[in-house]
Amino acid sequence: MKFTVNSNELSTLLQNVGRLVPTSNASIPALANYLFEVTSERISVTGGDTSMRSTGVIAPLESDGEMRFLIAPTPLLDYIKSLPVQPLTMAMETTEEGARYIHLIHSTGYLDIPVGDADLYVSNETPGATDGSVMMSMNSSSLLAGISAVLPAAYPDTSREQLHGVHFVMLTDRLELCATDNVQL
């Protein structure tokens, strides 16, 4: 099984999702990896810890099947960042001993990176109604537009923590953002 993706799009996605991947002392070892979920229409990359999770999606240039795997962020991201913009093919391979790895193929070479079993990753099930948590999904451009609209009113001095930053209010049908400098809201 293999898929092809634009190296620049994948690099940007990995950098954005990777901000939540713990680099050391992960309470669950699988969380120190990216979770890749590939279909013919989309490539989903998830990263996070036990309290927060981020998932990004890009479209593959081509894909010949579905696959799920865990992969360490450092070797993958460091290698992809060093490549010029080009198609990057990632093929799942299995050794005779049963070990799996991703074979990254590009115009000037290749790299093999071991991968783990995606079933070890903490499930991304919708939170139950009894635990009080909610799941929200939104377009990143909508979130950026909301933050950009309220950020001019944010109080710049960190000595008054209650006025510093942007406040998020999650309601059942929308997300409200608020900021104040004690003059404008």
Provide a role label for each language-model segment.
Residues M1-L185:
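Structural preference for solvent-exposed beta-strand-turn elements
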